[in-house]
A protein has these predicted regions:
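C-terminal active-site subregion of NodB/CE4 polysaccharide deacetylases
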Residues: 2-102, 109, 180-303
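Generic enzyme active-site microenvironment
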Residues: 102-103, 169
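Surface-exposed cleft-lining segments at the edges of enzyme active sites
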Residues: 55, 136-149, 175-184
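Short loop/turn segments at strand-loop or loop-helix junctions that form parts
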Residues: 46-51, 130-131, 170-173
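Histidine/lysine/aspartate-rich catalytic loop segments that bind and position anionic ligands
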Residues: 153-158, 162-187, 193, 201
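Acidic (Asp/Glu)-rich catalytic clusters
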Residues: 35-40, 74-76, 116-123, 153-169, ...
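A short, conserved beta-to-alpha structural element at the edge of catalytic cores
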Residues: 122-144
Length: 303
């Protein structure tokens, strides 16, 4: 399969990340202490796609590396559900290094190892699902494009994941680029249609949505307005950014955890180059959250 070259390149990136982290460890330690002492520690939300050893892709992490990630995260962070991460970042003060774990798409192999491993450790995660591949059994379009037709989850597996205590989230019906859709009806069909399918499977209520691809250009004001109107508790992007205490917390920024251990450690040990989000967004951040959504968020964290 034509994906070996990116993994060789990723090996060099891991080495470079380790070297840079080593060179800046003193600066990072001082910054960590200052943020903890000042109760200003940002919250990280990680996203994975597929945990498997066979057929590696740029959005796959090996079982061994996933275990290493979890070991290190458990030693250094509170690992909390997405709703609790949202609650903490809405508080003006946070002194506890905090991580939430999410998955995108819905790959069958996650039921072989990742989900059981999280369950064994009693760790929470939110599992965002693109529904049409689950219904049809067809591989995701980005896998077909890379000549690597990996199996999606089945409806029964999604139900099993939910029954195991993991939260299910929306990820559109067809894993489309929402930023390319200009008609409200098309955006509704992809976002709300996917959520309705998930809830019809008995895995709701669906509280969170993640944008496929997740870069700023893959989002839109139309979609954000629709999510607010539909009463969802928040949405996730995936372009690599922290979430700072005292924010509204409807937009949840995520960090890509698939690439490897050293890039993950470099991010989460406070790389000073990445502390602030300088991305131009095609939507206005909500300035306040409707009270009914805040009440729903309180109920989620109380469960």
């Amino acid at each position: 399969m034509p994906i070996a070259a990116p993994h060789i390149a990723n090996g060099y990136r891991q080495w470079a990340a380790w070297l840079y982290r080593l060179a800046t460890r003193g600066q990072r330690a001082k910054l960590r202490r200052r943020l903890i002492d000042g109760s200003e520690f940002p919250i990280a939300i990680l996203f994975y796609h597929r945990v498997a050893d066979a057929h590696p892709t740029p959005w796959t992490i090996s079982r061994r590396n996933f275990v290493r990630h979890l070991d290190w995260l458990e030693q250094n962070f509170d690992i909390v559900p997405l709703a609790e991460a949202q609650r903490r970042l809405r508080n003006p003060r946070n002194a506890r290094p905090t991580v939430a774990i999410t998955f995108d798409d819905g790959y069958a192999e996650n039921c072989d190892f990742a989900i059981p491993e999280l369950q064994r450790r009693n760790l929470p995660a939110t599992y965002f699902v693109a529904t049409e591949s689950v219904i049809s059994g067809r591989p995701f379009g980005h896998d077909e494009k890379n000549n690597c037709p990996l199996p999606p989850n089945t409806i029964a597996e999604i139900r099993d994941i939910a029954r195991a205590g993991f939260e299910i989230g929306g990820h559109t019906k067809n894993h489309v680029d929402i930023g390319q859709l200009t008609q409200r009806a098309a955006v509704e069909e992809e976002i709300l249609g996917g959520i309705k399918e998930l809830e019809a499977w008995g895995v709701g209520p669906i509280q969170f949505f993640s944008f496929p691809f997740g870069l700023p250009q893959n989002t839109s004001q139309l979609a954000v307005d629709l999510l607010l109107e539909a009463g969802l508790s928040g949405f996730c992007t995936a372009y690599g950014a922290w979430n700072w205490p005292g924010s509204v917390g409807y937009h949840l920024r995520r960090i890509h955890a698939d690439p490897g251990m050293q890039t993950l450690k470099s991010w989460l040990t406070l790389d000073a180059r990445k502390l602030r989000d300088s991305h131009a967004l095609p939507f206005c951040e909500p300035e306040r959250i409707p009270q009914k959504l805040l009440d729903a968020s309180v109920q989620l964290t109380a469960v």
